C-alpha cells in the first residue's frame, strides 16, 4: 500500500497552515453604522505599513467613535495615491476621491473601486489584492442593484448598498517582476505558507504519488481524475472540464 500523499497531508493542516506571526491583522472596512448609511464620517491616515505575506500595503486610519468619546483605529488595504495625513471620508455623502469609501449606488458608472463588499456590511470581499480593481458598469435603482466587472472579467450583480473604496489597490505590477532566484522564492513563501519547494509527482517513487515510478519520468496514464476519486488518487487535473491549450480569443460571459 502506498503512503499518504502530499495533498492528503495538506488537508490535515498542521505544518501546511498559513504563517501569521508577522501579520498586521484583518484588513476590513468600518462596521456599517448610522453615520455611514445617512451621512459620512472622517478619518485620518496615521501610517502605511507592510503586511507580511500580502502584496499590498495596509493603511492605519483613525476615526472618532460616533457613540463614545474615544478613537478607533481601522486597518484598510491602501489604495494607490493614499498617503499619511490624508483625510478619508466614509459614507453615503462622501466625496468621490481616491481612498474614500462609498456605497456603489452613490458612484457614477465607469468608476474604479476596490475592496468591494459582496453583501452590505461584510466589510470588503472583492478586488483586494495588489493592483486589482472593480469597474462599476451600471445601476438599477428600481431593484437597488449595481452591475460590476470583476478583475477576472466576469460580471456580477451586487446590492447598491455594498460599499467600495475609490481607486486601485496599491502595489500593482508586483507579479511582473520575476523572482529570478530561489532565495527570493524562499523568503516569499516563508511568510505565506509551507508550499515551496514543490517536488513533482513524476519525480517521486510509486509509493509517494500516483504519478511516481518508471524508467523515465512520465505520468503513464491520463492525468485527469474524477471528482469522486478517493483522496489518495487525487493528483493531477482534478475534475477537469477540458485540458490542453486554450485556442482562439477568450470571451467573458455577459
Curated annotation (Swiss-Prot):
One of its GO terms (biological process) is cytoplasmic translation. Pfam families: Ribosomal_L2 (PF00181), Ribosomal_L2_C (PF03947). One of its GO terms (molecular function) is rRNA binding. The keyword RNA-binding applies. The keyword Transmembrane does not apply. Keywords: Ribonucleoprotein, Ribosomal protein, RNA-binding, rRNA-binding. It comes from the Eukaryota. Gene3D superfamilies: 2.30.30.30, Nucleic acid-binding proteins, Ribosomal protein L2, domain 3. PROSITE patterns: RIBOSOMAL_L2 (PS00467). One of its GO terms (cellular component) is cytosolic large ribosomal subunit. InterPro entries: NA-bd_OB-fold (IPR012340), Rib_uL2_dom2 (IPR014722), Ribosomal_uL2 (IPR002171), Ribosomal_uL2_C (IPR022669), Ribosomal_uL2_CS (IPR022671), Ribosomal_uL2_dom3 (IPR014726), Ribosomal_uL2_RNA-bd_dom (IPR022666), Translation_prot_SH3-like_sf (IPR008991). PANTHER family: LARGE RIBOSOMAL SUBUNIT PROTEIN UL2, RIBOSOMAL PROTEIN L2. Belongs to the universal ribosomal protein uL2 family. This is Large ribosomal subunit protein uL2. It comes from Eremothecium gossypii (strain ATCC 10895 / CBS 109.51 / FGSC 9923 / NRRL Y-1056) (Yeast). The lineage of its organism: Eukaryota, Fungi, Dikarya, Ascomycota, Saccharomycotina.
Amino acid at each position: 500500500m502506498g503512503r499518504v500523499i502530499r495533498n492528503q497531508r495538506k488537508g490535515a493542516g498542521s505544518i501546511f497552515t498559513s504563517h501569521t506571526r508577522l501579520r498586521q491583522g484583518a484588513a476590513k472596512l468600518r462596521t456599517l453604522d448610522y453615520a455611514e448609511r445617512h451621512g459620512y464620517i472622517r478619518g485620518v491616515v496615521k501610517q502605511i505599513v507592510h503586511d507580511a505575506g500580502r502584496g499590498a500595503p495596509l493603511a492605519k486610519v483613525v476615526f472618532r467613535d460616533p457613540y463614545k468619546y474615544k478613537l478607533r483605529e481601522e486597518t484598510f488595504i491602501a489604495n494607490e495615491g493614499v498617503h499619511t495625513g490624508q483625510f478619508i471620508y466614509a459614507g453615503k455623502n462622501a466625496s468621490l476621491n481616491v481612498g474614500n469609501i462609498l456605497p456603489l449606488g452613490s458612484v457614477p458608472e465607469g468608476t474604479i473601486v476596490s475592496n468591494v463588499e459582496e453583501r452590505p456590511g461584510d466589510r470588503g470581499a472583492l478586488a483586494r489584492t495588489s493592483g486589482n480593481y472593480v469597474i462599476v458598469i451600471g445601476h438599477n435603482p428600481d431593484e437597488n442593484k449595481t452591475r460590476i466587472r470583476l478583475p477576472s472579467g466576469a460580471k456580477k450583480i451586487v446590492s447598491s448598498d455594498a460599499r467600495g473604496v475609490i481607486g486601485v489597490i496599491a502595489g500593482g505590477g508586483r507579479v511582473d517582476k520575476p523572482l529570478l532566484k530561489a532565495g527570493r522564492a524562499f523568503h516569499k513563501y516563508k511568510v505565506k505558507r509551507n508550499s515551496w519547494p514543490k517536488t513533482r509527482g513524476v519525480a517521486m517513487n510509486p509509493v509517494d504519488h500516483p504519478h511516481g515510478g518508471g524508467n523515465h519520468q512520465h505520468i503513464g496514464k491520463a492525468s485527469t481524475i474524477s471528482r469522486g476519486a478517493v483522496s489518495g488518487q487525487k493528483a493531477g487535473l482534478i475534475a477537469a472540464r477540458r485540458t490542453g491549450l486554450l485556442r482562439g480569443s477568450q470571451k467573458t460571459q455577459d
